[in-house]
Amino acid sequence: MHTYLDFEKPIAELEGKVQELKLLAQEDPSVSIGDEVSKLEQKAAQLLQETYASLTPWQKVQVARHPARPHFLDYVERLVEDFTPLAGDRLYGEDSAIVGGLGRFRGRSVMFIGHEKGSDTQGRIKHNFGMARPEGYRKAIRLMTLAERFGIPVVTLADTSGAYPGMESEERSVAEAIARSTDRCLSLGVPLISVVIGEGMSGGAIGIACGNRVLMLEHSIYSVISPEGASSILWRSSDKTKDAATAMKITAQHLHELGVIDRVLPEPVGGAHRERNQMIKETGDAIAEELKGLEKLDADSIRRVRREKFLAMGRIGFS
């Protein structure tokens, strides 16, 4: 059963009517309603296209959080052959909110690292809804260092509402872990491609997303804080989330204009969750293209290009 968002109610009504008519036709073949079904399907498709062509920032937040949106393990399952997960930070323990491992991607060895939110209740609990603890970032550091040692490129997929803010995270220095993970990204001597596939919130996302090339799916979001958090801090109210989402310029389109990201990957009409396999394949194509563009650079050039890219942020309008 498809999950509809609040702003999709008119679409849900039309698609629901189409399903009702199709069931009626199955129950009574003598009923001729083919033309009516076709008209409703066209109307629903047009409404879906018009709706997604003019989404507000807050509506994009809702799409980025859609429960059926493909997650890290969905991408790994369809893009990576012989994936071997690697667990533990070798300091404290294992954190399932960040998953990483080696595999074959389009004929080459690649280290894949990313946030996993989980797709059902059991999975969400296991992966802590994609909110990583310190050991998750320290595991990412370990895997990136391993990839560098063997000259293997790294691909990271960010999808988190933020690092886990619990007491145990603070006791084990989550801020320090994120800072060191960010530094490891910036100093890595192999190509690093980062893709924001859903939510990219705060240091929790940045800690694994400082790539040579940073890509975002069309309806994903990327920001230092969630709209709810910004509303609470700036307006002392939970009623200003829509205003916060607009003011912070958290959409892929805004961030591309500002030079924060390098590329926006178009999503199927209706979002990545409607055509999961298509979205995953096209994301894989983009990753392969970006890796090919970096394969001739030596380690020093890879580091220099990446650092210059991030140091240049914020200079737009000042030169």
Swiss-Prot record:
Major localization class: cytoplasm
What domain of life does the native source organism fall in?
A: Bacteria
Alphabetical list of Pfam families matching this protein? ACCA
Q: Which EC number(s) does the record attach to this protein?
A: 2.1.3.15
> Cross-referenced InterPro entries, in alphabetical order?
Acetyl_CoA_COase_a_su (IPR001095), ClpP/crotonase-like_dom_sf (IPR029045), COA_CT_C (IPR011763)
Please give the PROSITE patterns that the UniProt record associates with this protein: COA_CT_CTER
Q: What is this protein for, i.e. what is its function?
A: Component of the acetyl coenzyme A carboxylase (ACC) complex. First, biotin carboxylase catalyzes the carboxylation of biotin on its carrier protein (BCCP) and then the CO(2) group is transferred by the carboxyltransferase to acetyl-CoA to form malonyl-CoA.
| Name of the protein this chain belongs to | Acetyl-coenzyme A carboxylase carboxyl transferase subunit alpha
Q: Which organism is it from?
A: Parvibaculum lavamentivorans (strain DS-1 / DSM 13023 / NCIMB 13966)
Q: Which gene encodes it?
A: accA
